[in-house]
Amino acid sequence: MGEVRKQIRALSKEAGGKARAASAAEEWFQTSKKAVREKAVSRSAGPFEPGKIYVFRYENPISAFWWDSNPVVLALNKADNGNDMGINLNMLPVKVKEDLLDFIYDQYQGYINGQTRGAKTENARAQAPLQFSYQGASRFLKRYGFDFAIRQYAMTRKSQQVVVSYENWARIVLCDFLELNNSSVGQIRAAFRKHLNK
């Protein structure tokens, strides 16, 4: 069992079930986001840093028929056109989210542990990014048929952006912040499969 899944199990046991743990995680996030001195969830107005998880509001993009107004994004390297790019974790089933973050944690465990000590403990902005690229993410998600979850985000359409510390990946996995417009995850996945089979 991976580290993120272990932490989710511990949070679920402490809360008296996974549903209660999810409610507690969402309450923790909203409280932390508003707290001025809180660093585990920290305001971040700049571009994405790879390997970090961001939550933000996203306005209707002109070029997209469907979009998520409240993405939870595991950041990748910047797109060639200059947009931020990442995996919208809201689009993934819980098991796939857990598998993905466990996979990344296992790959970078020593590095992440180094970023969660001393002054960097629970300090999302101070923690250094990971070298996690589009190529690696795409290979992983293709195994599940969910590489459509890799999205681009224009800086001008993002607002209220915060970054979450590595120590709290398990909590953010439990949160359900999806606000999908003009479609459903099932419809998007079906359309994506149809596109791949052309």
Predicted feature descriptions by range:
Residues 3-53:
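Mixed-charge, Lys/Arg-rich low-complexity intrinsically disordered regions
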Residues 24, 51-53, 84-87, 125-127, ...:
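N-terminal functional modules and adjacent low-complexity/disordered segments of proteins
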Residues 26, 64-65, 167:
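Short, low-complexity intrinsically disordered segments
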Residues 29, 67-68, 170:
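Short linear interaction motif-like sites in intrinsically disordered regions of transcription factors
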Residues 55-58:
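A generic structural signal for residues embedded in beta-strands
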Residues 64-107:
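Basic/aromatic-rich interaction segments and small domains that mediate binding to polyanionic partners
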Residues 91-198:
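Intrinsically disordered, low-complexity, charged/polar segments
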